[in-house]
Every structure is written in structure tokens, then in C-alpha cells.
């Protein structure tokens, strides 16, 4: 199912709002949407909400044989799925261009940046290593999928615990969580993607674009960075040309946003760990606020209405008057008038239908009698079967008879007179029969 395209009015409205440095949800140009992180009952399961965009992250592991060229390193695998539950435009089981681009960007952001120590995932060199699989499911799409997916992936990896193992000779022993505590992954840093949307060929910039803003943007710049201000990857799409100063400015903004998001992630991990140690309630069910009626509500957007009247007066004063202004009504026909800029009014003349309506309102209900028409070939007298002239009234139920002239009007006259005499003779015979019967 294809997505519903934006109308021209919506597109112009969005672009006009961006030019005035306003956004539909009330944010400023460099503001991020609210980020909410909730953890499941198992380690390595989390849901990240970036506004209305929701991504579910799940990490799993298994012992496999290593790659031939990297015998002492573990394997990282990332998989992002776009289901129709998130948006009707996504087709299940099909590798779209958007899905391929997002998966490659996640691999460059997390795997190529060496954020996880893959050598610590080795159990037996050349024989057994841990394969870490990160599955990401998009639950709801409201724009900026890559930022929400990168946050969900790194949060799930930080929250994940793998089973402990021991090696004695050639025997590898795998312990359950009851026998030994699971072991967390060795993470060097936390790279996070920050997206920048450009409009009007790079003139205007927005951070964290939503779904509607992504439809009207000209290009997208994604910068993956950690809290140490180290750029892990950078990608530009959309075919726009960016200046060096624009890229530097975006990198500075990304550094500030990444530091804030990293602090939020660390606090969420610490709170979850504290609740688990204290034996409190945790999981997705506990993170839903079910005691509030307005748990799911639209955030209010403040609007400044202080200078609306002054602005309206300025617009009226700056507006240019039309070239020709008519201050008095222009009489086109009797009973009509027009006040405007002097353009000829095509509605000035009364039409036939309006004349008929006026005659009906005035009480003129006289019948229209068709007179004998005079043709070039001769005169034709239109007489009915009983010698009475044909009368057309205003009633819509009666049939209308259209008389067409013939080539020989004298023959038509003779035929009509013969038809009139014939029924008169028949009527006389009927009267005689009635008298004899009596």
C-alpha cells in the first residue's frame, strides 16, 4: 500500500512554517523530541520512544565458529525490520531501498566504530566465539527511524548479559544464570546517530525531523558520534551540496545532543539495575502509566499571540491597492449593479430562465398560443383533429407538440380538411341508429 501523498497546501504550509522557524509540534529548530526508554523482564530487551517513533530492540547470542580471517574475534549481526504495523507503506518480507540503507548505516555506526570489544567474545580461538545478534523492530513510524534505531541498539547491547563459560582443555562448559551470574558485554563507547534535515537547498536546518518534515525536506545529514566528540560515521543523502561550515556546525550540534542522550541512557540503565537488585517490579508492563486518564495525550504547543493585531495592520498597510477602484455601483442593466474593480461582469444581463421566473412571480400565467407561421413557400394553418387551434400552457405534465413545415403546404391543407369531415359523417350515422333503436 502506497503512502498518502501530501497535498500542495500541506507542503506549502510546512515550508512556510520552517521559513518562520516554527514546527508543527511546537519545538525549536535544534530541539529533540522526548526520549523514553523502558526495559523488559529479560536482559537485552528494550523499547525506545522518540516522540511517537517506537523501536523494539532485542539482543541474543549463541556459540558459533569464527570467520577464517578473524579467528579470535566474535561476530556482530544487526537486523532492522520495518513492519506494516509501523506504517501501511512498508511491505513485509521485502528488502526496500530504505531498509537496506538503514541496515548499512547501523553496521557502520556500531560495528565499524569498534564500540564493542569483539576479541572478548572469543571462547576458543579458531573454534568457538560468541555471535551477538541485534534485532530491531519498528513499532510505529513518525520520522527519524535511524536515530531511534541507533539508540535502541546501543541500549539493548549495554543492557544485555551473556551466559558465563569456562574452558578446561577441549571442553567448553556453558553455565545457566542460576549457576553463575551472566556477564555484560565489553563496550568501549556509545555511538549515537543524530539526523539533520535541510530545506530550500540547505538554507534551513532542522534537528530530529518528524515524518511530515521528512517528506518535504531536500536532503538529510546523519552524523554518528560518541560523548567524546569522536565522529564514527557521517552520511549525506538527497543530492544537496553542503558547505564545510554547515558540516562543522552540524557536528557541534550533534556533540551536544549526543552528550545529553548518553547521560539519559546511563541514568535509565542505572535505575533498571537498582530496581532489579532491590527486587522491585520491572518490565514493560510496569513502565505503562495505567493510573492516568491522559497517559497518551498530545503535547501542547505554545503560540505567541501578543503582536497579532500589529502584524495584521502592517500587512494591510504594506498591501498595494488594486489599480482601478470603483467606489460607486456600476449599473449594467436595469435592476442589477456591481461594486468592484471595474471588470466587466458576465452576470449583469438577465438570462431567459431569470425572465421566466420573474414572469411566474408576477402572476403572469397566460397561455402561449401558437399562431400560423409564415414560411417562404407559403402559409401553413396548424389545426387539430377537431378544428381547434393548438394551445401550449405552462403545465409541465402536458405534452408539447412541435410543428415542422412541409414542402407542399396545400396538400397538407386538403388532408386535414378531409380528416375533419370524415368523423362528422360517422357521428350522423350513429345518431340515426340510436333513433331507430328507440
From Swiss-Prot:
- Here the segments flagged for biased composition (Basic residues) are 427-438
- Xref: Gene3D superfamilies: GHMP Kinase, N-terminal domain
Q: Where is this cross-link: Glycyl lysine isopeptide (Lys-Gly) (interchain with G-Cter in SUMO1)?
A: 297
Citing just one GO molecular function, the answer is: mRNA 3'-UTR AU-rich region binding
Q: Where is the composition biased (Acidic residues)?
A: 349-364
Residues of crosslink Glycyl lysine isopeptide (Lys-Gly) (interchain with G-Cter in SUMO2)?
Answer: 297
Q: What is its main location?
A: cytoplasm
Q: Which residues lie within the region annotated Disordered?
A: 337-365, 377-438
Quote the subcellular location field of this record.
Answer: Cytoplasm; Nucleus, Nucleolus; Nucleus; Nucleus, Nucleoplasm
> The organism sits in which domain of life?
Eukaryota
Among Pfam families, the record links this protein to: RNase_PH (PF01138), RNase_PH_C (PF03725)
Q: Does the record's keyword annotation contain Metal-binding?
A: no
Q: Name one GO cellular component term.
A: nucleoplasm
Q: Which cysteines are joined by disulfide bonds?
A: none
Carries keyword Ubl conjugation? yes
Q: Which UniProt keywords apply?
A: Acetylation, Cytoplasm, Exosome, Isopeptide bond, Nucleus, Phosphoprotein, RNA-binding, rRNA processing, Ubl conjugation
| CDD domains in the cross-refs | RNase_PH_RRP45
Where N6-acetyllysine occurs, the residues are 297
Annotated function: Non-catalytic component of the RNA exosome complex which has 3'->5' exoribonuclease activity and participates in a multitude of cellular RNA processing and degradation events. In the nucleus, the RNA exosome complex is involved in proper maturation of stable RNA species such as rRNA, snRNA and snoRNA, in the elimination of RNA processing by-products and non-coding 'pervasive' transcripts, such as antisense RNA species and promoter-upstream transcripts (PROMPTs), and of mRNAs with processing defects, thereby limiting or excluding their export to the cytoplasm.
PANTHER family on file: EXOSOME COMPLEX COMPONENT RRP45 (PTHR11097:SF14), EXOSOME COMPLEX EXONUCLEASE RIBOSOMAL RNA PROCESSING PROTEIN (PTHR11097)
Indicate the quaternary assembly: Component of the RNA exosome core complex (Exo-9), composed of EXOSC1, EXOSC2, EXOSC3, EXOSC4, EXOSC5, EXOSC6, EXOSC7, EXOSC8 and EXOSC9; within the complex interacts with EXOSC3, EXOSC4, EXOSC5 and DIS3. The catalytically inactive RNA exosome core complex (Exo-9) associates with the catalytic subunit EXOSC10/RRP6. Exo-9 may associate with DIS3 to form the nucleolar exosome complex, or DIS3L to form the cytoplasmic exosome complex.
**The protein, known as:** Exosome complex component RRP45
Q: Which gene carries the instructions for this protein?
A: Exosc9
Amino acid at each position: 500500500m502506497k503512502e498518502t501523498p501530501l497535498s500542495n497546501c500541506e507542503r506549502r504550509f510546512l515550508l512556510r512554517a520552517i521559513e518562520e522557524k516554527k514546527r508543527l509540534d511546537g519545538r525549536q529548530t535544534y530541539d529533540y523530541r522526548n526520549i523514553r526508554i523502558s526495559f523488559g523482564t529479560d536482559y537485552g530487551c528494550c523499547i525506545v520512544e522518540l516522540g511517537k517513533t517506537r523501536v523494539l530492540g532485542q539482543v541474543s547470542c549463541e556459540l558459533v565458529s569464527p570467520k577464517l580471517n578473524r579467528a579470535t574475534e566474535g561476530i556482530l549481526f544487526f537486523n532492522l525490520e520495518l513492519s506494516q504495523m509501523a506504517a501501511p507503506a512498508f511491505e513485509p518480507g521485502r528488502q526496500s531501498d530504505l531498509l537496506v540503507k538503514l541496515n548499512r548505516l547501523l553496521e557502520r555506526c556500531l560495528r565499524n566504530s569498534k564500540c564493542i570489544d569483539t576479541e572478548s567474545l572469543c571462547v576458543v580461538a579458531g573454534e568457538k566465539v560468541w555471535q551477538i545478534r541485534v534485532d530491531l523492530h519498528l513499532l510505529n513510524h513518525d520520522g527519524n527511524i535511524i536515530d531511534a534505531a541507533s539508540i535502541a541498539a546501543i541500549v539493548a547491547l549495554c543492557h544485555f548479559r551473556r551466559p558465563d563459560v569456562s574452558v578446561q582443555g577441549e571442553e567448553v562448559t556453558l553455565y545457566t544464570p542460576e549457576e553463575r551470574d551472566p556477564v555484560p558485554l565489553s563496550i568501549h563507547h556509545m555511538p549515537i546517530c543524530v539526523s539533520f534535515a535541510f530545506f530550500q537547498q540547505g538554507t534551513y536546518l532542522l534537528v530530529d525531523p518528524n515524518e511530515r518534515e521528512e517528506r518535504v525536506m531536500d536532503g538529510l545529514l546523519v552524523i554518528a558520534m560518541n560523548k567524546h566528540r569522536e565522529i564514527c560515521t557521517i552520511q549525506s543523502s538527497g543530492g544537496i551540496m553542503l558547505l564545510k561550515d554547515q558540516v562543522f556546525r552540524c557536528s557541534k550540534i550533534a556533540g551536544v545532543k549526543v552528550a545529553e542522550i548518553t547521560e539519559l541512557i546511563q541514568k535509565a540503565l542505572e535505575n533498571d539495575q537498582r530496581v532489579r537488585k532491590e527486587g522491585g517490579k520491572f518490565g514493560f508492563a510496569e513502565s505503562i502509566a495505567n493510573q492516568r486518564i491522559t497517559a497518551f495525550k498530545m503535547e501542547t504547543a505554545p503560540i505567541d499571540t501578543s503582536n497579532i493585531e500589529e502584524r495584521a495592520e502592517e500587512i494591510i498597510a504594506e498591501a498595494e491597492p488594486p489599480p482601478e477602484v470603483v467606489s460607486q455601483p456600476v449599473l449594467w442593466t436595469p435592476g442589477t449593479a456591481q461594486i468592484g474593480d471595474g471588470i466587466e461582469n458576465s452576470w449583469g444581463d438577465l438570462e431567459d430562465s431569470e425572465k421566466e421566473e420573474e414572469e411566474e412571480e408576477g402572476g403572469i400565467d397566460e397561455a402561449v398560443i401558437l399562431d400560423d407561421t409564415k414560411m417562404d413557400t407559403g402559409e401553413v394553418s396548424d389545426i387539430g383533429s377537431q378544428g381547434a387551434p393548438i394551445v401550449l400552457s405552462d403545465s409541465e405534465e402536458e405534452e408539447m407538440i412541435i410543428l415542422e413545415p412541409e414542402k407542399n403546404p396545400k396538400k397538407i391543407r386538403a388532408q386535414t380538411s378531409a380528416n375533419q369531415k370524415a368523423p362528422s359523417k360517422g357521428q350522423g350515422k350513429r345518431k340515426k341508429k340510436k333513433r331507430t333503436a328507440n
